[in-house]
Amino acid sequence: SIAIPPLGCGNGGLNWDLVKKMIIEALENTEAEIYIFEPNTDIKQALQTKSAGKDIKLTPSRGLITYAMYYYDSLGEDCSLFVANKLAYFLQRQGSQAFAKIKFQAHHYGPYSHQIDHLVYDLNGSYIKGFEQMNATAFEPLTMQHERRDEISKYVRTLDQQEQNSLKATIDLISGFESTLALEVLA
């Protein structure tokens, strides 16, 4: 027997209906029992509820990226892994020591780092929702928990001046570029 997961339909962002059809067509003449496991949104929703309210220790990188994401989200644009990567890249370019060691690589949509995925995952359940199981496409919206925004603002004010300046410079830089395409071009 063969068990097949929903290939490419998590982080890959592929349409499950098309993928399932391709799998069935490719394996229809196979003389084995085949089990195809479909994506399950109920699991993701249950995990969102379960992880809500967890507390994490704030660090400069967590505080800065969360503040920048709150700012971006408050402009009416959805935050996503794509947005988080671009904001982190800009923070690094603006001199933030908290992001100095992050290694960005050229990717489909500009600079990208898997380290940012882990940073966003750490924030999930406390400051954002939508990244349970580290499973979201680049542009899948992440829900910001705005009721904790004041906490982040207070934390950022405790950071050294260089970090605060890099955050201000990043916010100034993205002003007028509040869309995913504009962020990509800017990066």
Residue ranges and their predicted role:
Residues 6-8, 69:
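Short, histidine-centered active-site or binding-site loop motifs used for metal coordination
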Residues 1, 6, 14-17, 30-34:
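Catalytic phosphate/metal-binding cores of nucleic-acid and nucleotide-processing enzymes, i.e., regions
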